Amino acid sequence: MDRRASSASHLVSGALGGLVAVVLGAILIATGVIDTGDETVVRQGDTARPVAGGNGRDAATVNEIYRRTDAGVAFIQASGGSTGASPIPGLPQPPEGQGRSTGSGFALDDEGFILTNAHVVEGADEVRVRFGDQDSVKVQVRGADPSTDIALLKVDPGKVKLRPIPLGDSSKVRVGDQAIAIGNPFGLEHTVTTGIVSALQRSIDAPNGFSIENAIQTDASINPGNSGGPLLDGDGRVIGINAQIETGGGSRGSVGIGFAIPINLAKRVIPQLKEKGKVEHAYIGVTTAPVTEGTEGIDLPADKGALVQDVAPESPAAKAGLRAGKTQTDEGLVVGGDLIVKVDGIAIDEPPDVARAIADNKPGDRIAIEYYRGKKLRTVVLTLGERPKRVPQQGGRGQEPDQPDEPKPDKPFQLP
């Protein structure tokens, strides 16, 4: 850089800064903010403005929301076992030594149930929580689901004063809405950060390698130790569970891109965690890719859908005869496989739609899948399986050439 140009720009900046200061000073004197006499007069500023609530109306200030909800946010300490290392980059969980980790959570009800992330308590021999200035108490891990990264803890309500935080409706969240995160980043308890909902319907990786759909993206600062804490709307209701951050390739701290698990997903899994201690997810057993620029020139029969890349051995998809491709393009896309365009009557525009289409199903349910094999549109009915604990290793690629061309449904079924 030309040092003279740089110096000149600094001089201009300084001159402008001095001019602004003079003008601003004149304004402050004229308005009475600055007194030129011996006595200094300080005017009281405007009261804090309320932030816009999740439904667009004026709501409480951030301070009011913090004072109303902070007592319901828990500081979680997990020790023993394999705690202290996140299985996926971006999970904001700091190690605090061998087999020890910390995180956040929040009171769900007066019965003693607490929500947090599964990766915060995974493998722990002992989990303790502390609300505000109360004593730390031991809690039971009632259940955990690595596929959604949600864990449900249970504390004796007689041993701690609980201040449940009301749950919102994540389906009503809109981009630009107020977002407030409360938690314990780097062990700094009672920390509140604010921002907005930056984007919706993000797909993030769960600790077991499966995808979590419809995650909420926010620029409210989320750091290691925030995991499991609440993401609140402008009315102080929980719209998400803070779970992951984009680190920017090396940094352990926030770069303004954080992700929260939608609270509506938590509402769906809580009953199973209470009853069974685990969640049974429906499973097809395919890995798919979108129809994008990388598929140009392949002459696909549709411009939307989920292109099958891999079929897990012994999965419902494999048993039904769905096929993956055999040829890999320069972009790494596997072509020549089936193109899924509809699942259980729901149109498939992109791969995440497949998971969304079966989200409300359970293992054992039977669904119809419409797909193209070459130019021919076909339909197969399969019985959904139970999702394995971790994503199966790829390598099936589907049927071998000498296998039958037609998929084999379990038995005749009335198509939707």
Residue ranges with predicted function:
Residues 375-377:
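Short, exposed coil/turn segments at beta-strand boundaries within extracellular/luminal domains
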